Each structure stands twice: as structure tokens, then as C-alpha cells.
């Protein structure tokens, strides 16, 4: 009816798919069904009230012509979300190369994509893109409310599988993301849920920031970078019941490594200025293995943090870095509470390592002066029923506090 042609890479079906979506929206909304078969396409635009439904065996596959992908068009001011200024990783929503995407949802509500089919980004490269190679994002969502993405798989993303700006009351559930760079990257969110997803990504599995009432739960995250990386401050963030592990199944495309970094990395300002306060962060019942560190929190000078609660964290085969909550400048955290945590670290068998830190500036530290937990510039640390163990030999102390006003550490 709309002229889509399956299993023919020479055909760009974007026109047919967009006609079907427009027709559905003009009739009050509903479902646009993509049947079994592979449909090559450039940029597709979702509309309010329309669900794009991918039947089992249905594949939307990106065409290899970079000219078939449009950049983001929006009147939203997204300048606060820019990052990486002055580097090859500069990210700006106004950059016509960075903001290209295969599927757009812009300024719409009560729409999404569901089903058991697949979206294949086809690893389309763009010599004018980020790092002179990254292509279009697979899905780009901006200024939307009530979005639902459920059940389907995304593979071979040419940049992020999902990039979102300023979204509200939206859900990402039961998704499979394989390969590419970041999995779900959201800059600006209110009441957003990421749940029951499985990701094997070359870059961060979940990333972004300026989140409010974000819930990340019951996911399996495997990454050759960070499992969860927050680069802009957030409030009321719950990270619960996730399994985060390394090494990565898919290599980091830029560096070719498969080593996993932090399971959870909260570093506002890590990719450029991101002023603001973090507060009411809860990290509960997460299972971590074979990563660099279970948790790294680093505040920049224009950040502060209220409360951080860590409960029932199980971490095994931590390869190099202690759990840490810190700032290297003036920024302070009010309170860190830990309960019932059990963490095992690989030791560094070097008797000279403890003395190496004497009179060394922190900027030269390759690891921490301790192997288990490190706290710096925190008003209060309250840890009970925390077990730290080391595999092999290590001559450093298990924990350290630096410029901590009050601490109560009850270790098992």
C-alpha cells in the first residue's frame, strides 16, 4: 500500500515508511506494522500517537549513503548538554554531522517502537562525523513525553543506539543492544525508566546526565568502557538490581580495547562543564564482576553532592581500582552511607607501591594508595557490614579517608 520493498538494499524505504506513519497519525494514531523482511532505510520520523511495531523477523536496516540521513531539526535550546568542546569528541545537537540519525522522535508524545524485530544501524561511517568516522545515531529522541521503546533489538549502531534530549515520563524496557558505541545515552530526563534490557556495547552502556527521578533497574550491562556513566549531575537517581560485568563482548571501536572500566561512573563535568548538585543517589542490590572499579564518584569544582546510599553491592574480580567517592578540588559530598557490601579486589603484588605515593600529587596517581575504598572531601562516611577482600598480595591499606569530617567504618 505504501510501496515499501523488502530484501533489496538498493531501495531506500524511508519515503514509504514515513508515508505510513504520517497516514496513521492523520487518522488519530495507532500502530504501523513492519512485517517480516529486511527494509533498508534512511531517516524515519515518528509521530505523536503512533507506535512503530516490528514483527518477529522484521529488520529496519540503515542504508550506506550518509546523505540519506538528516540532522536533528528542533527549536529546543539544547546548548547546556554540549560536551567535549575543543576535542574530536565534541557533541552538539546543532552539529549537522553529530545529530544525524536513522530514526527521529522530535517534539512528540505517546509514541514509540515495540515488537520483537530488529533495527540494524549497519555501522555506517561518516568521515565528517565524531572522531572522523562515527555515523548516524540509530534513534534520536528530543523534547518528547510518554515515549515507549520495548522488546526489539538494536545492532551495529554507527554511533549511539539511542540518543535522547529532554525527555519525560518515558520507558526503555526489554531491549537488546549489541555493538556500536553508547547504548542508551540521555541528556536531560524526568521520570525515565531503563529496565530489563541487555546491552553489549563498545562504549558506555548507559550514559548522559541531568537526570531527575531516573530509574535504572534489572539490566544486564556489558561494556568495553563503563556500564553506567553519568557526565552531568542528577537527582533522585536509582540504580538497582543490575548485573554489570566485563570484559566487553564488543571492542571499543575507537581504542580497540575490551577491558571494562567502571561498573558505575558518576563524574559530572567529566566531558566539559556541567554545573549543579547531585543528591539522593541510591545504588542498591547490584552485582558487579571483572571491571576496573565497582563505583567511581568524582565531583568537579562546580558540583556538590548531598546523599549517596550504597546497599547490598556484590563485586568480584575488581581488576585495579578501589571504590571511590571524591573530588580533587573543593567540591564536597555531604553523606555516604554503605550497608551490606561485599567486594573482592585483585591485589597488586608490589611491596614498593605504598611508599611510591609519598609526596606525589594526586594528578600522578595511577591507582589509589589503598586497594578497597577511598573517600575524599566528604563530610560523613557511615559504612556498616562491609566486607573487603583481596585476591593475591597487596601491601597497601584496605581503605582511606582524606578530608572527611566524620567517619564510622564497620568492616567485616
Roles of regions detected by a PLM:
Residues 1-412:
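Extracellular/periplasmic carbohydrate-active domains that bind, remodel
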